[in-house]
Amino acid sequence: MGQQPEVDARGFTLLELIVTLLVVAIAVGLVAPAIGRSTEALRVRAEVAGFSATFRHARERAITTRQPFTVAVNPTNHLLTVTTGEDEVRWTRALSGSLAIEARTPSALTVRFEPQGTSSGGEFRLTSGKIGYRVSVDAVTGRVRSLRE
């Protein structure tokens, strides 16, 4: 009769909770910087895609309207300006201020697309931090390519 019933041990001890929280904190500490780098790479890739798309669109418009289109790159103001043969500004595209733009040659800062699909050609290097891309416009075909360096 003097026997006491056993109590089922349910729940976690304080030590188990502390160890679990420590493991979670270490995991978050390792994963968070990788997520930050990943989002920066995605942002730069999106900017480069927009940069390339401006050239592609200007080429398509030159072919469909049968008039030359020119894309002028202003690396200082991070701005692309698209004009027609009469120097009429058709549209502009602002780029991120953190994106550095370099032309391989100074004359490449202006790329002219002809109605036949050809262009004056050009090559650009776009960088943000350690992430870099090379965008080239072929002179013969007018094709625009972007490659990560």
Residue ranges of model-derived segments:
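N-terminal helix-rich module
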Residues: 1-8, 26, 30-64, 68-149
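Glycine-centered recognition micro-motifs in short, flexible terminal segments and loops
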Residues: 1-21
